[in-house]
C-alpha cells in the first residue's frame, strides 16, 4: 500500500512518466470517466504495480466502479489498469442514477465502535460531512461530480466505490458481439505489457440503465 499523500503523489508521478509516450491519446481536456473493475485475464497474476493503483482507486472488488477525472497524470494509470478494467464517459443521467440509487458512504457516529456503510439517502448526512465545502445535499454531489468541480476529489472520495451487479460484457442485445470484442481484447492484453494493452471502453449509460 502507498502509505501517505507524499508517497502517493510520487508513485503516480512515476507511473505518469512511464506512460508519457501514450499521452497523445489524451485530448488535453479533463474529462469525467467511470472506471469499473473486471476479472482480468484468466489465470494471470496481478502485478504489484497494478495492485497498488487498484488500491489507490479503491477498486478492490470485481464489478466495483469509481468516478475519475481523466487528466494527463491519470491517463497512464488507466493504461496500466487496462487488462483489469473497462471505462466509459457517463452522461449526467447516469451520474444521477448511480448516486441516487447505488451510492453508499462509510461513516462513524458517536456511538459506533467501528465505521459502517450506509446508503446515501439523507441530505442531513451530506451537509454534516461536506457542508464546509458548500455541499449540502445529494444533488450537490451530482453537480460537483458531473461538472468536475474543484471539490471533485473530496466528493468522489466521500462516496464508497459503486457495487455493480452484472458482468460488463453480459448485458443487452449486443452481448454476444461485446463478448467477442472482449475476447479479442483479452488476446491482445495477454501478449502486451499492462502499459500498452488496449483500454476497453463500453457504453456505460446502457450498462447502468440495465441495472437500475
From Swiss-Prot:
CDD domains, from UniProt?
A: Ribosomal_L7_archeal_euk (cd01657)
Q: Which InterPro entries match?
A: Ribo_uL30_ferredoxin-like_sf, Ribosomal_uL30, Ribosomal_uL30_CS, Ribosomal_uL30_euk_arc, Ribosomal_uL30_ferredoxin-like
Instruction: Name the GO terms of the biological process aspect.
Output: maturation of LSU-rRNA from tricistronic rRNA transcript (SSU-rRNA, 5.8S rRNA, LSU-rRNA)
Alphabetic keyword roster: Nucleus, Ribosome biogenesis, RNA-binding
Q: Does the keyword Thylakoid apply?
A: no
Q: Subcellular localization, per the record?
A: Nucleus, Nucleolus
UniProt keyword Lipid metabolism, yes or no: no
Question: GO MF annotations for this entry?
Answer: RNA binding; structural constituent of ribosome
Major location (coarse) = nucleus
Q: Which PANTHER family match?
A: 60S RIBOSOMAL PROTEIN L7, RIBOSOME BIOGENESIS PROTEIN RLP7
Family membership: Belongs to the universal ribosomal protein uL30 family.
Q: What does this protein do?
A: Involved in the biogenesis of the 60S ribosomal subunit. May act as a specificity factor that binds precursor rRNAs and tethers the enzymes that carry out the early 5' to 3' exonucleolytic reactions that generate the mature rRNAs.
Name under which the protein is recorded: Ribosome biogenesis protein RLP7
Species:
Cyberlindnera jadinii
This protein's encoding gene: RLP7
Amino acid at each position: 500500500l502507498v502509505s501517505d499523500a507524499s508517497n502517493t503523489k510520487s508513485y503516480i508521478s512515476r507511473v505518469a512518466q512511464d506512460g508519457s509516450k501514450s499521452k497523445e491519446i489524451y485530448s488535453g481536456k479533463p474529462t469525467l470517466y467511470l472506471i469499473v473493475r473486471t476479472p482480468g485475464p484468466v489465470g494471470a497474476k496481478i502485478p504489484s504495480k497494478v495492485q497498488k493503483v487498484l488500491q489507490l482507486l479503491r477498486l478492490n472488488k470485481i464489478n466495483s466502479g469509481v468516478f475519475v477525472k481523466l487528466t494527463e497524470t491519470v491517463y497512464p494509470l488507466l493504461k496500466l489498469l487496462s487488462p483489469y478494467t473497462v471505462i466509459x464517459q457517463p452522461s449526467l443521467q447516469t451520474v444521477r442514477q448511480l448516486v441516487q440509487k447505488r451510492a453508499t458512504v462509510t461513516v462513524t457516529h458517536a456511538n459506533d465502535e467501528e465505521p459502517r456503510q450506509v446508503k446515501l439517502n439523507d441530505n442531513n448526512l451530506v451537509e454534516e460531512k461536506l457542508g464546509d465545502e458548500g455541499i449540502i445535499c445529494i444533488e450537490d454531489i451530482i453537480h460537483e461530480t458531473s461538472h468536475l468541480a474543484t471539490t471533485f476529489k473530496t466528493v468522489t472520495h466521500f462516496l464508497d466505490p459503486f457495487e455493480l451487479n452484472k458482468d460488463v460484457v453480459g448485458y443487452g442485445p449486443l452481448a454476444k458481439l461485446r463478448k467477442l470484442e472482449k475476447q479479442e481484447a483479452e488476446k491482445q492484453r495477454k501478449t502486451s505489457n499492462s502499459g500498452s494493452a488496449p483500454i476497453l471502453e463500453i457504453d456505460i449509460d446502457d450498462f447502468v440503465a440495465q441495472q437500475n
